[in-house]
Amino acid sequence: MSQEQAALEWLASLYSVETSFWDPVNHRVRQAAPETLLGVLRALGAPVERVSDAAGAGRARLQEVWRRAASPVAVAWDGTSAGVELRLPASCGDSAVACALRLESGEERRWVTELAGVTAEEASEVEGERFVRKSLPLPGGLPWGYHRLTAEIAGKPHEILIISSPVHAYLPPEGADHRWGVFLPLYALRSERDWGVGDFGDLDTLMRWVGELGGDIVATLPLLPCFLDEPFEPSPYSPVSRLFWNELYVDVPRIPEFEHCRPARALAASARFRRQVESLRRAPLVDYRRAMALKRQALEKLVKCLFARRGERLAAFERYVEAHPILQDYARFRAAGERQRRPWTAWPARLRDGDLRAGDYAEDARRYHLYAQWQAHEQITALCGGGRANGVELYFDLPLGVHQDGYDAWRHREAFALEVSAGAPPDPVFTSGQDWTFAPLHPERLREQGYRYVVHTFRHAMEQARLLRIDHVMGLHRLFWIPHGAAPGEGAYVHYHPEELYAILTLESQRQGCAVIGENLGIVPDYVNPTMSHHHLLKMWILQFELQSDPRAAIRLPAADQLAGLNTHDMYPLAAYWSGEDIRARQRLRLLKPEGARRERADRAAITEAVGMFLWQDGWLPRPSGKPTDIFAAAARFLAASRAPIVVFNLEDAWGERDPQNVPGSGRRHPNWRRKARFRLEELPRRTAVVELLGEISRCRRSAGVAG
């Protein structure tokens, strides 16, 4: 290794960047290219243009680390902290530190610590100067919360965020386990009253039906706002923001204003409007642009009626807006974007830099977004409250990132590394790697900002949810960063501060009474699952990943801390998996080479035969069968009787659906996030086989709870 390469790898280590990763496709350790490391390091703030800059940048980084004086964040688990990390010149290592701690409640505590009585944990010489590392003790018994410590060191004040958090995330009380539920994307729900896309009213209908069958949970995809005009990106995993809701799902006739708003009612009753609704309703795929445009026409009339009547409802609206100040900012951003019709990075400088004024947008558009968010909030709140009253909870999903042209990346841009994309290295399914196209969060700037954006993100979801899935939970530890312009597999892992992120997650979880499920699928480092267990996060168990070709042990059993399911939204339904349709489709989409397809088909044939034998021998099938609907029914009963605390089934598996909702890596070659369910909600109670199977699942779950 050359001296310059060694200096580059040293610099990477100082920024917590891994210089290599395991390539499971070629079964070897793969080194990140120098150009990749330079791009990632620049995104982290390192002053490097070429490899020859690494040595000087490393020396500067080392000085920065040791001259920081105080870490910007410290964690107190269950009220007790190991202290605040201090890095000081040895000449200041024995000085007195005046401390003022302001608790979240407003209470203040003051004390002075003599560092002469604190043992140094490390010593180092940097550019000829000696430094020491010590821990500044904190008082014990701190209440939960986000507290602010001001530590005056050598005459200079330093602000430190103290996160006092429970070690464990919230879990439901004993007796609330052995629950079951179903999954369907909200956009896919069909009914006799929908406007071309499922809405919160349809979700309410589904929740009530599941509750009548003894179910406890309805899971769906993220319910966050998306770009549905220009720009256009309907993926629920690329939202405009993780701090607001998707107005597409508002059930317009349920809005109180609708009853008294003649213009809105006249619009909805007009022949032209009804023809458009019927056209959207009949289509097998969701037409997001048309559906959103249609719904917006009605919402705009409702907001005008609200302001014209000037009654208690207007007062309630104004109270809501006043209580949510960032909503005003969001509405201005969306309204300005509609006028500009281009990404915020291409806006005039003042707007791009976050200074929006009244003339920069249409006032009607601003009011529309305020009103649409209020209605989305009201309907989700009613949905969650009503569902809990009926014993059914919504299982929310929090995506890993946001659209790079969206509100969060604009207003909270310092929290993001906008020069790179998050993704994943090559794996057996995606042999070229994946570029997810959104900007990852910046680990150091998050700390400097006191994790404000992360706190608001978790809190927004947990205020409504009682079950929250964290997409790609490995992202609390590290993420694969890909410099812009590089191929998907040409990235490097960047590490975060997991203790601090878990502290925020468990604190918000306990405060809101929301259990957390971590999506730990794919490439999972050895330290992730033990950390999840330590903090009482539920893991995921997916049948298609737990199958093997031994008929005596064809299915690995789920554990008592795993949410179990047959598949995910990124996988083909069970019937397609069973017939190998997923393999053929990936070949057509050029996501799988012929040799890999032959190998997968052979493996799949051995697995499906073994699973059929296993389910028959174990008593879940009355006779050996390879029919997908039989396998689904048997596997569903098998999982329902397991010790998994929660089991969630893709409802479409119950009728043998073969088309997936999403094919990762397919881009526009597949209608991702658009396919509607085969049956309307009104038809489901008449699907005798489905109703009987869900009834069996419910009985198996209750029996497992009694036995367990």
Annotated model-derived regions:
Residues 1-47:
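Basic helix-extension-helix modules of the SAP/HeH family
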Residues 106, 230-381, 401-646, 652-653, ...:
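Alpha-amylase-like alpha-glycosidases and glucanotransferases acting on alpha-linked glucans and related
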Residues 154-159:
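Short acidic/polar inter-strand loop motif in beta-rich domains
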Residues 656-706:
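Structured C-terminal cap/extension of enzyme domains
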